[in-house]
Amino acid sequence: MTTTNNVLLVDDQHRNIGVTDDLHTIESLKSELTLDYDLPTLCGKNLDSPNILLNSIEKFKETFNKHYPFLEKINMKNLLIAGGSVSNIVRNKFQYGSDIDFFIYGLNQQEASSRVRQWLIDILVKKPDNSSEKTTTKKIDMTKYYKIIRNNNCITILLDHGDLKLQLIFRLYQSISEILHGFDLGSSAVGYDGENVYFTTLGKYCHEYSCNVIDTTRRSTTYEYRLNKYFDRGFNIVVPKLDLSKLKTFNLKYGEVEICELPYFIFSYQNIIGNKIIVKKFYDKYNIKSDYGLEPINSTNLYYQSLKINIGNLINDVDYYYYVSSHIDKQNTDILTKAPRLTKGDIITFYDGVRTKLNGKNIDVCLIRKYITIDTIENIVATMFHKDTNVKEYFDSIIEKQKELALNKLDILLQKNHNIVWITENPGKQLTSSFNPIIEVESKWYGEFYKE
């Protein structure tokens, strides 16, 4: 059994609810290690460049606080920052704009909801500066302007015009180890609790050897996208069951690339050296890029975008809404309990706007399909073009009926409880790692390139 497979075995043995062990601290990290390439590996152009890691908690804290000064003094009790934001600093490859993902552990649901409130206050509510020290350096307040978005899966703080995103995930864990063993990739299995940085055995291995290891039992709807993302950050991809003998090589003789088309993962490669496959490019076929359901929203137009999403979900009976705020204080954290960003006036104004667009010369079929549900698109179009139809009167009638339907649904929605609903159960094999796990046989991921 290879070293890589041994590491996967250790990880699998600790992927249990309530796990507390299999944690390594930052001081145990070793730099300048190189894979032995005993398994097929997708490699970037800097495949064997020196990998210098931070292995001092003091240096890590100094660097972390330099980049995120607004987090330096927050209370981290029962909180863990995990994933890429921590990994980037450990690897001396800080990337501004990386999401900062917070997780809660060791609390029940009521305690966790209170902890979210305190988290918001700690980060966003200003405390008086009692420092008597004089300084000529002007501090930049990164939290002066912010917006908060909440959906069913997480609450997100957008800072610096949306360039920086803090997320707290609505899933409860029992321990730090349980959080880290829930990640799908070793490159993400690293966390910071304000006092130390922790890795699982797999996380430590992947950071020391700059790699991720394909483990199809950890797949989710974002798995391949995340492999690609971390590859761009310098993590090669070990593909244990890839049959190298089935990779094409004819074009390589002429300095051209070949294509490997796995069922879920397509890439071109420009050379094969032993088990090293030198990748030229990945081909993006990823429709979902976040497990937490936060759609790409422009922070400057946040309210209108969230309104459109909420109306679309309301009329289509999709129980998934956005809650939005741009101000909190100690007495007001109602984004945790209030109804979604949606009022009767919003619905009336929105559908009056739809009416204006539909009464024009150009009929927007996509608009009708998305926001008109009282009849099928086929019936609406057929009626529009009927010789006896007064199109303006017809659309006026449709809009008024659709308004009434939406307003009735809103009345029902406003009567519901809008507190945080915490996810506490384990979705199958994946130990709470993904909101959208995919459980399939390993061979299906590899297709014709599978080697047992």
UniProtKB/Swiss-Prot annotation:
This is Uncharacterized protein R883. PANTHER family: REDUCTASE, PUTATIVE (AFU_ORTHOLOGUE AFUA_3G10540)-RELATED (PTHR43558:SF6). It comes from the Viruses. InterPro entries: MGDG_epimerase.
